[in-house]
Regions:
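Short, glycine/acidic-rich hinge or "gate" loops at secondary-structure transitions
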Residues: 57-78, 390-402, 479-487
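Active-site-adjacent "gating/activation" loops or surface patches in catalytic cores
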Residues: 120-121, 126, 134, 161-162, ...
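A generic secondary-structure signal for well-formed alpha-helical elements
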Residues: 7-12, 16, 47-61, 100, ...
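Conserved redox-cofactor binding core of oxidoreductases
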Residues: 19-168, 411
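A glycine-rich dinucleotide-binding beta-alpha-beta segment and adjacent secondary-structure elements
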Residues: 110-113, 132-133, 172-175, 325-336, ...
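Glycine-rich loop(s) and the adjacent beta-strand/alpha-helix scaffold that form part
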Residues: 159-160, 169, 173-177, 181, ...
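Conserved, non-catalytic sequence blocks in retroelement Pol enzymes and Pol-derived host proteins
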Residues: 86-88, 144, 367-371, 409, ...
Length: 487
């Protein structure tokens, strides 16, 4: 959709931060909370660069020389403002912001990789201003207003002589040297069914986070995590996103026009994210942002009805018709703490089309996250009830007590962990530079690096780390290949 967040400085040093603020015994033993091994200040130049690659729109809340009005007061200091001004806010998010402000909270426009003016990024890619067409969410942008890897990067580098993409190539495994200390390349399958070995001095694991874990496990890279002994690292600390929300229905005086939407259009508060609020007596770690967003009013997908409406029939049709123009949605986008019992491994029975064991996911919501979601959802519901012209509200919590995680209802695609970064090889797959402890010429990218998941969408943090890794690979490793940290 284009939500583009930076992590809070405390997010990247979570264990150290909570122990320093609340004491060494505050974090329970059933949570694998870890520091990332890299700080906000180290990543800030890379966050800034990536925001410029995407033509990000927003309002800065904290600059290096002090706070700014209208932005997120809890964010880390920025070296530069967003490259584009914030998006224009529709009725629903505006009313949410007004109610939040009256309650003493700090609303600001959602940071968006949706351009708000003509823009040329550092690679020379041109973006156009968003038209609020309502077909951004779950789709590409035909108007070139939403940041996209093809638009923002690929089109600018595809003609480089030292760049090539092998299309229709399925990587089957990473090959290792005889002593197992380095990778020698990858073996992939062509669309003609031919196995090809591609030698490489450096192997970058650039698949989606889950598939990086799978490829490592089937290739024998690193040490697989064993939940019984709690040893090994590949597949450890799998985490997700903890979602809740509130539906808000207005009287006929408020017309929200939901069909005028964009991927990352909305107003947010960060007052209950991370450790932006006192956790002393709450019984949980983490938090989440609360946002009122307006992405689309597509009739097959968007059918808001008040609580108690029948699921079908004439009364359902009447409720859809009467409420289509008078509805807003609040989202609680919560963190997800890693636990010893949530992990990824190879399935002992099922195999894929290439004869490899499938990846198996073992996950349920930790009690910590259930309590967090219930608390922050209560704050969202409080704001909803204080919005003007509201006739009814209804809340939902995917992590409610008594409900197990289900992969069936869409929540997010924010799968994290399994290839965690850090400074301790017994609890991380890669070091602080994204380099594998066990195979120094293998570098790993993506949200699999997160030791636990934040209350934000993962794109901004993972790309900040990606540019940090590339910087050290290019300027430190290539000239002298070696482990960049001692194990």
């Amino acid at each position: 959709n284009g939500q583009l967040w930076r992590p809070l400085p405390s997010d990247l040093e979570m264990r150290s931060h909570y122990e320093n603020r609340y004491g060494a015994d505050f974090i329970p033993d059933d949570l694998n909370v870890q520091d990332w091994g890299v700080t906000y200040d180290e990543l800030e130049p890379h966050f800034d660069f990536y925001e410029r690659i995407c033509g990000t729109s927003g309002t800065a809340g904290q600059m290096a020389d002090g706070p700014r009005e209208g932005g997120n007061p809890f964010e880390g200091p920025r070296s530069a403002d967003y490259p584009n001004p914030p998006m224009r806010q529709p009725i629903g998010p505006t009313k949410f912001g007004e109610a939040a402000q009256k309650l003493g909270y700090h609303p600001f426009p959602l940071p968006a990789a949706n351009a708000t003016k003509e823009y040329t990024n550092p690679y020379g890619a041109k973006l156009h201003p968003c038209t609020y067409c309502g077909f951004c969410e779950r789709f590409g942008c035909g108007y070139y207003a939403k940041a996209d890897p093809i638009i923002c990067v690929y089109d600018q580098i595809k003609s480089h002589e030292n760049f090539e993409i092998r299309y229709q190539a399925q990587v089957l495994r990473v090959e290792k040297s005889e002593d197992g200390k380095t990778a020698t390349g990858v073996t992939y399958l062509t669309d003609a069914g031919e196995e090809v070995f591609q030698p490489a001095d450096i192997v970058c694991m650039n698949a989606y986070g889950l598939w990086n874990v799978h490829l490592m496990l089937v290739s024998g890279l690193g040490k697989p995590y064993d939940p019984k002994t709690r040893t090994g690292t590949v597949g450890r600390n799998y985490a997700y996103q903890t979602m809740a929300g509130v539906n808000v229905f207005f009287d006929d005086q408020v017309v929200t026009n939901p069909f005028m939407g964009a991927g990352a259009l909305g107003t947010v508060i960060d007052d209950f994210n991370g450790d932006n609020f006192d956790h002393s007596d709450l019984g949980f770690l983490g938090g989440g942002y609360i946002a009122c967003t307006q992405t689309n009013g597509r009739p097959i997908n968007y059918q808001p009805t008040p609580e108690g409406t029948p699921a079908w029939g004439a009364d359902w049709k009447r409720a859809v018709r009467e409420n289509y123009l008078h509805h807003a949605s609040l989202t609680v986008h919560g963190s997800s703490m890693a636990t010893p019992d949530n992990y990824l491994d190879l399935d002992p029975t099922w195999k894929d089309a290439y004869g490899r064991p499938l990846l198996r996911m073992t996950f349920n919501f930790p009690e910590n996250d259930r309590r967090m979601a219930d608390y922050v959802m209560g704050k969202a519901h409080e704001i909803a009830r204080n919005m003007e012209n509201v006739t009814s509200t209804s809340a939902s919590n995917r992590a409610a007590e008594g409900s197990d995680y289900s992969i069936v209802p869409y929540q997010t695609t924010h799968n994290t962990g399994g290839t965690v970064m850090g400074t301790d090889p017994t609890t991380s797959v890669v070091n602080r530079f994204g380099q594998m402890w066990d195979h120094h010429n293998v570098f790993v990218f993506g949200a699999g690096l997160f030791p636990q998941n934040l209350g934000y969408n993962p794109t901004g943090p993972l790309m900040g780390v990606a540019y940090w890794t590339l910087d050290h690979m290019k300027n430190d490793y290539i000239t002298n290949p070696r482990p960049l940290m001692d194990a």
